[in-house]
């Protein structure tokens, strides 16, 4: 779809805005499947597509802002409220994770076929958005940055059972877990979405 949009806007030199970007499930239902972590993983892959096209896509969203019934919202307001507070849907958690950990400039990246990865940078800090598309196994990688050495890093990870559904009773189920990266190897859990910040220094060649 985006490649067609590129062709359409090319003569005008304009950038695009994307709204109402959420999934829509056919039939008379509230799209309950969108409360599962499987939907969160799928949405992360769409966000990666948006990032890869950031040169023409100026602003985008993958959800309606908030609501109390339909699951296409980023925030659900329980109704009746009682003692429960509004909570983020999987798409909301993923959008927040990506927005908080992203660089100013896109950089190219290569990765195994079962991962979906985009990369960006701000100075010597490299940011990775990584989706493990496999629901059945983790994937181990060796991280390398051309011309630079990774000194340390922080990892923000969401990894849950793809069939798990978030509700007002488990509002923080998809809260990212922060971990330290001390080497160049990392294992991405099955069905996970991860944001990484890598502190790097330029390699000095003899």
Q: Which residue ranges define each predicted feature?
A:
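Acidic, Ser/Thr/Pro-rich beta/coil linker or hinge segments at domain junctions
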Residues: 148-190
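Carbohydrate-binding surface patches
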Residues: 114-149, 155, 191-197
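Composition- and surface-driven signal marking solvent-exposed, interaction-prone regions
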Residues: 31, 36-39, 75-76, 132, ...
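Short beta-strand-to-coil "C-cap" segments at the C-terminal boundary of structured domains/repeats
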Residues: 196-205
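A short helix->loop->beta-strand "cap" motif at the edges of active sites that frequently abuts
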Residues: 12-14
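Aromatic/acidic polysaccharide-binding cleft in carbohydrate-active enzymes
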Residues: 16-127
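Flexible loop/turn segments at secondary-structure boundaries
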Residues: 23-28, 66-72, 135-138, 162-166, ...
